[in-house]
Amino acid sequence: MSNLEVRPAPSLCGGTGRTGPVRDVQPGKQVPLGESTVVRRLLPNLGRRMVGAWCFVDHYGPDDIVDEPGMQVPPHPHLGLQTVSWLREGEVLHRDSLGSLQTVRPRELGLMTSGRAIAHSEESPHGHGPFLHGAQLWVALPGAHRDTAPSFEHHTDLPVINGGGLSATVILGELAGATSPGTTYSPLVGADLTLTAGTDTRLPLDPDFEYAALTISGESEVDGVRLAPGTLLYLGCGRGELPLRADADSSLLLLGGEPFEEQIVMWWNFIGRSQQDIEDARTDWTTGSRFGTVHGYDGDRLAAPELPPVALKPRGRVR
């Protein structure tokens, strides 16, 4: 998925700074995605740019797309990151410049590693179902791996942890001894948590990780905080477990990882280490080099926005 903001602001994030356990509720914002989809952007937000290596989170739906085209994101580039496609309802057709062609369905992991450069498109396939509901997330690649070869993975058999009214699907990384088959380049976790009505349980966590949670359906209570869709709850580090409650059926995404100590520059769909990295990537996309071609998409590719006239300034992990 692309960041389709007309004037995406460059930002430098990461760097040192650990916190103990906190409960910081941070609102997201509504962002149009293509012609027919509006997403809730929860990361980066007004208070925080990263949670571990997680640096971008869009939650969309559930949307009724019976008489709509659904998701239509033309070919666009990525650099220095991984994209994680996660669906609750519907399906998304992924194409990329490696030649991958894959339909991603609910509770299947679509994991694309851009490494040094890749381009892809995402669209609701012809004859798509009535609803679309899911999340698109990005993971920043550490400096040692940012020039790795691009790849795409599709995993349909993900580990699930069940108990106490909680069902946790490990999307990426490791949680409570269960490990996703998706490739990772830094210690992290992404999990889909389903809570049945009456759930009152505690989920084991890694105290070295920082965590955040966001509700994707219903309303639940996370460490005593009532959490509805549209907000992100930053939980900090130093937690050995996480209290979870639900009066009605609900679901959450849990994101975590070791605090990302490197400083990164993120603009549009690129992650680099300097403004020059970003400028070079934009030039290469505009001139048709480095990122390759997405074959089979019926339409034009996305044009890169204009770079802002300001120099990048260090901002740290929080704004």
Set out the residue ranges of the language-model regions.
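Jelly-roll (double-stranded beta-helix
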Residues: M1-R319
